Swiss-Prot record:
Function of the protein: Catalyzes the condensation reaction of fatty acid synthesis by the addition to an acyl acceptor of two carbons from malonyl-ACP. Catalyzes the first condensation reaction which initiates fatty acid synthesis and may therefore play a role in governing the total rate of fatty acid production. Possesses both acetoacetyl-ACP synthase and acetyl transacylase activities. Its substrate specificity determines the biosynthesis of branched-chain and/or straight-chain of fatty acids.
GO terms, biological process: fatty acid biosynthetic process; secondary metabolite biosynthetic process
Taxonomic lineage: Bacteria, Pseudomonadati, Pseudomonadota, Alphaproteobacteria, Rickettsiales
Recorded metabolic or biological pathway in which this protein acts: Lipid metabolism; fatty acid biosynthesis
UniProt name for this protein: Beta-ketoacyl-[acyl-carrier-protein] synthase III
Alphabetically ordered keywords of this record: Acyltransferase, Cytoplasm, Fatty acid biosynthesis, Fatty acid metabolism, Lipid biosynthesis, Lipid metabolism, Multifunctional enzyme, Transferase
Keyword Cytoplasm: yes
A Pfam family recorded for this sequence: ACP_syn_III_C
Amino acid sequence: MRSSRILGIGSYLPKSLVTNDDLACTVATSDEWIVKRTGIRQRYIAADDQMTSDMAVEAAKLALNDSGINKQDVDLIVVATTTPDRTFPSCATIVQSKLECKNAFAFDIQAVCSGFIYAMAIADNFIKSGQVNVSLVIGAEVMSRILDWKDRSTCVLFGDGAGAVVLSNNSARNTGVISTILYSDGTLHNLLYTSGGTAYNGVAGTICMNGTVVFEHAIEKLSASIVEILNKNNLSIDEVNWFVLHQANIRIIELVARRLKIPSEKMVISINQHANTSAASIPLALSYAKNSGKLKQDDLVVLAAIGAGITWGVCLVRM
């Protein structure tokens, strides 16, 4: 039976580093206030002439290099993003062009912070069905372009960046992407959204959020989804090496760990370095875990994310 395995991981953060102290010069906040409530210490901001596709390409190049896969062997490119270069064409087709992956078909997926999990599920199913052998799965965002920089409740939370993985056909049993579960609840769409839209008013708008309610849903839904995927695969928390949750807020990660009795040392934490990068969050955290020597071959990993929509998802992977 066909399955897909992560062969390579890559990440990219733009050059401009903005610390909490930098933000304190423009809005009523402080490093202490931000760190205590979010765990965020800094974020990276894309240059004015830097597009989502540019960052996606840099992350993809590193993932391809890490995998040893030739770009001409890529059959599919899926880009998870909320902030594409343009309304159309898709960011993925621009990435395909810049990478010169001439044999790949490409499209975007929009599930905001859950986007990378959704993209993984889609690419995994294409591989399992036999339609493709190699897929690039990318999460990339320029969240800074949809922020109100005078609103301290949102502008301190987000950053820009990109992460990518190479998924390839794998014949070994119980390795690679073992299981994925996706969820949506559109009745909660008004908890987190932008004030604009192509059809709505013709502008991108800025992020609007009911932070308290989103926080509560994140803890509840991430916890429940992790329990479900472990039960589905007859696994215990003790058997999992790493839990990589969406890097939105350190308190969410800590409270999920406490609720499920997950040892803190099993939680991958990178939010302090790059803030909430939406769809790029999970691959950035994976890249951090690998580069820091935490993530090893054959490790069992749970990936889980929640985002606007509301959408959420969980993925069980054997590295």
